[in-house]
Every structure is written in structure tokens, then in C-alpha cells.
Amino acid sequence: MPTGFVAPILCVLLPSPTREAATVASATGDSASERESAAPAAAPTAEAPPPSVVTRPEPQALPSPAIRAPLPDLYPFGTMRGGGFGDRDRDRDRGGFGARGGGGLPPKKFGNPGERLRKKKWDLSELPKFEKNFYVEHPEVARLTPYEVDELRRKKEITVRGGDVCPKPVFAFHHANFPQYVMDVLMDQHFTEPTPIQCQGFPLALSGRDMVGIAQTGSGKTLAYLLPAIVHINHQPYLERGDGPICLVLAPTRELAQQVQQVADDYGKCSRLKSTCIYGGAPKGPQIRDLERGVEICIATPGRLIDFLESGKTNLRRCTYLVLDEADRMLDMGFEPQIRKIVDQIRPDRQTLMWSATWPKEVRQLAEDFLRDYTQINVGNLELSANHNILQIVDVCMESEKDHKLIQLMEEIMAEKENKTIIFVETKRRCDDLTRRMRRDGWPAMCIHGDKSQPERDWVLNEFRSGKAPILIATDVASRGLDVEDVKFVINYDYPNSSEDYVHRIGRTARSTNKGTAYTFFTPGNLKQARELIKVLEEANQAINPKLMQLVDHRGGGGGGGGRSRYRTTSSANNPNLMYQDECDRRLRGVKDGGRRDSASYRDRSETDRAGYANGSGYGSPNSAFGAQAGQYTYGQGTYGAAAYGTSSYTAQEYGAGTYGASSTTSTGRSSQSSSQQFSGIGRSGQQPQPLMSQQFAQPPGATNMIGYMGQTAYQYPPPPPPPPPSRK
């Protein structure tokens, strides 16, 4: 090429340093002196001096033009990006395989998150005053006597500790004197009365008091702090340009933060309150734009909020209402240093509300450091407790038996009309492997864990909520904060490392006042957690698997295999453990012992039969035969055998009138035993059989058996057929 063409080509290819620096400076709002210092950085040469450091009242990171912005990820569902769970993957938006000029060095990071944030020295005399007590006691509440207050708290299992004088609890939403637009949304969502944590939490939060709320999962804690926050914000001056949020909610995971933001949007839009949700794993641009426009409510995970505070994208000067949601979970995830850095940026006379499901010493220490003269509200037992609306079934098995038992259990669950199920596993690899195996066998399963990109996690949760994929396999990233109302089953494929995680896992079902069932596979390798699990079961009045008791008594000797015969040699009358054991065996033994399941997999059925199977309408069409011979085990006909089974000694009449009792057809077309006959072989003659599971709380009026009260029908399918007669030679 002639040399005369080199210079023009270079002029075209090389961008002007001054223009690029001016573009960056105008986007970041830098001054002229800063643009001059940033100009050499756009096209560095060997002689160029290093950029000068500009001193600001607030530290602000200057973006380097040499580092290119990442392209959008074109394949968000096919790549594994980032590491860790929750918010720890907040640095995913740096250049990687999807960025231009791949292989470039990532931007320089400081050693610890929040290292550049300095603790502010507050002078309360110079800070503007603000009001935080807006509670006006309703006349109906004011007329309550001390005795009636104590009875109301006892009935709702509310315990109040600390503080000078605690307001009386409310027992209706209008007692809290919320604005009419808030009451309208409550009525639209068909809320009739506040939950126990809301009964005492509303008066405390509206009074401007610091408080700690300890309650089980799904107890309505989100509304307990968001509705008072709306009242608090509406009594503050309007935001001005450059102001940060008035209400800050810290949450441990992205999923919980998004759910809180959805609730805040539902209740705040009528009063034109703006809210935003900032979390890692998502693009920073939209989140920064929301903060720059001004939001009254900010729901954030600690890591991403630290990033924005360090870079000067937001500030907490106007924050007067601080909420720490799932405080115990944030400490478990190692966010305590970030939380302390964030709280140091907020004025000390703020109102602080801390919410947790457990009360370990780490959470107590955090409350002592952040809260002033606080009142503690406990709903239920202060000890670790599970939701009493959850039926807990523990199956003691070996590690190698889990897959087989899981498939048998899923065959039973998928026959239910409401069959949304969450399966919890311990590791990300097992989560992917189990999902791959189940999908290969035709199960509509999807998975979620910390290595999934945020778009994929959102997509999976939407598919799960809509019912298109009723099986969700997850790690502990979803064990807290995931709020899906109609989850009916939770399966602990792997038992968690602590009883606290167990309680939060099974708490994904039976949200609010619903019922649910939790299955747990417990292996001898989980022996260290056995005693704590038994305490949780006893506190919830659940029957305890005798294998689990034997595992504790014998320190895991034999894996619980020998205890079976020991318990079965005793009388089965009035033995709740035996009835529990029989029910677990009947549910989980499957085809091998002649159970209620056919050998065909969910994926092997035709579209018509599969739809009927998923809708709980039986096994395919009403006239389809179940077994090798037509009419042998005909479902949907009202009896368990239209023809004789085997020889003449096993006739249909003898079977219907024998030990198994007569059967009746339910509305769904499935055959089930009546409650008076299902235990005909258990108990003493002339004595009313005990309800299955022997739950020790009051049975509702009109209920004929307790298992129906706990969310399951007594027997959804007919009993197994009798064994064939011995062959005669």
C-alpha cells in the first residue's frame, strides 16, 4: 500500500481522545477540569502522565473509558455465570465471554465491599427534624381492658418483651387508621383481618418505635412494615433532586427483594409513591436511572447497594425508616460487614425495624447495636418452630434409595389437582443433575440456584408460578423469601445443615392460612441433626417416625433397619408412631409392594390421560383398565374389582366386605375408603380408631378425620389388592 494512504486511514480508525472523554464526562456530569484529567486516559501513550485525582465532598468512582461496557447477554439461559448465591454475584456485569474485546482485564476492585465508605459523624442538632409517631388509638382499641388485651395476645400467641409501654394490639385493619387508598387495596385483595404479627406490629411501627418481630415464615411480615412505611413517607417533605430514599428495606436475596418491591408497588402507586429494587445479577443502568429520578422506597440487597453508595449513585441522607428483613438469613450469608457499613450512612435517630424467623445470638447482637429502646414481638414459641399448618412426614432411608423414593412420591403428588412442588437439594451440581434426570424422564421440572443468571431465574419463577412447570428444584437460595401462595408440597431431597434452614424450607408451603405437606428424606449421614429435627416435630405436634427415634437412640446403628421389627412386634392399638409408619410406607413403597400406583411413568401416558392424571381425575379415562387383565382393578367404577381376583376364594364380594372395608367413589372419580373403615384392622374391637397422625390440637367441628384437616384427603386411592393365593401343586 502506498505510504500516502496510511495517515488518512489512521485518522479514521483512531477516535479523538477529546471527544470520547467529553462524551464520558457529559454522561457522568464531570466538570471541565475533570474532563481534562480524563482525556489522556482515553488513548494512553507511553509519555502520558497518570490521571489526576479530584477531591470531592463525596467520593465518586470515575469510569475509565478504556474499559468497555459489556454487551447484553444474548443467551441468558444457556450459560453459567458468576458464583455464589443470593446477592454475592453482584459483579456479573463486567466484561466476560459476551463482552466486546473478550479477554480484557476486569475493572480494579477494592479488597472488601464498602472499603471506601467512611463512617459518618452525625450531629443531631444540625439535622432537620422529622416526625415518626403517627399512631392514633382507635376508640374500640382504647376500650380494651388489660385483661382483654392479655387474652387477645394469648389467643394469637403474641409475646411482648422490652420497651417502656407497648401499644395495645389491634384486631381489625381499620383500627390502625390507615389512609383510605391503603384500605381500598386491602379490600381488593380480600384481606379480612390482620395476622398476629400485624396485630401488634402495626401500632408499634406507626408509633415510631424501634422493634424486632420474630414470627414464622408466611406470617404477613411484609405488610407489617410496608403499610406503616407508607404512612411514614407521606408525612415527610417531598424528595428534592439528588435525595436518596426515605424508606430502605434490606433483603438477603434477589427473589425476596423483588417480592417486597411488588407489594410496595401495589400499595404505593395510589399515593404516587415510587419504589425500586436494586440487586446483583441485573444491569445497573435501569437501577441507577430509578435512583436518579428519585424513589421514596428502595428495596436492596446489601452488595449492590454498597456498590452504588461507593460510586455515589445514591445516598442515604434522607433515610429515616430502615427495615432489615430476614436478618438471620443475611447474617448466615455473611452480609454483616456490609450491613454495618450501610447503617453507618444513616442518621442515628432513624426508626429501625428488624424482622426474623429465628432469634440466635448473632441477631440479638445486631439488634443491640442498631436499635434503641426497642420492643420485641414474638408470635408463637420463641424456640425454633415450624408452621403448624404443615404436615411433616420424615422418611428414614439410605442415600441410594432417594431417587427411587422421589419418583414414587412424585407419581402420587402429580395425581393431585394442586400439585405445585418445591424439591430442595444441597448443592448446585446436584440441582442441575436431578433436574436433568427428571426432565429426561418427562417430568415438568425446572431448577434455580445461585449460578443462574437473573433473567433465567425470573423466567423459571414465572413458569413455576403460572403452573407450566409445577416442579421446582432449588438450593437454599429459594428457601427464604420465595412467596408462591399455592405451593402444596415441599420435598427435602437433601436434609439441610441446620434446623433453621429446615424450618424455612418447609415454610415455602402453607403460606398465610393455607395447608401444606412437607416430605423429608433423612439418611444416617444426617444423624447430627436428628435431635433438633425431633424437637421441631414435637413442637409442631407432629407424629415422629420410629425409625428416626431409633436412629437417635442407637446412634445410627444399622441405619434404622432393625427398629422396624421392634416396633411392629408391639400392639398397634392407639400407637400414633405405628400409624405414622404405616402411612409413610403406604405412600412411599410404590409398585414394589402392590401400592396404588401403576407402573407407567407420567411421561408415558397419552395427552388425554396425562391431563386427567395431572388434574386429579384418576388414571386416564374412567373406563381404562388398571392391570394386566381388563376389569381386574378398574378405576372410576366405584369398586376395586369388577371381577374376581385369582381363585374363587378372593371374590369381589369377599374383598368388599372384608378387612379393607367397602369403598366409595369421590367427586373426582377416584375411589377412597370412609373414615370409619380405613382403620378396621387397627385398634381394639368396639373402640373408635384414632385419627391418622394423632395431631394433638383441636379438631375443627364437622371434620371426620384429622388428615383431611391437614390438607390431604384420607385415602385418595383404593387400598392395594390382596396377594394372590399360593400356587397349588
From Swiss-Prot:
The protein's annotated catalytic reaction(s) are:
ATP + H2O = ADP + phosphate + H(+)
User: Where does the record place the Helicase C-terminal domain?
Assistant: 405-552
Outcome of mutating D325N: Loss of helicase activity. No effect on ESR1 coactivation
In chain numbering, cross-link Glycyl lysine isopeptide (Lys-Gly) (interchain with G-Cter in SUMO2) is at K129, K528
What UniProt keywords are attached to this protein's entry? Acetylation, Antiviral defense, ATP-binding, Cytoplasm, Helicase, Hydrolase, Immunity, Isopeptide bond, Methylation, mRNA processing, mRNA splicing, Nucleotide-binding, Nucleus, Phosphoprotein, RNA-binding, RNA-mediated gene silencing, rRNA processing, Transcription, Transcription regulation, Ubl conjugation
For whether the record's keyword set contains ATP-binding, the answer is: yes
The segment annotated Interaction with YAP1 runs over 718-726
- PANTHER family registered for this protein in UniProt: ATP-DEPENDENT RNA HELICASE DBP3
Q: What protein is this chain from?
A: Probable ATP-dependent RNA helicase DDX17
The organism encoding this protein is: Homo sapiens (Human)
Q: Which gene encodes it?
A: DDX17
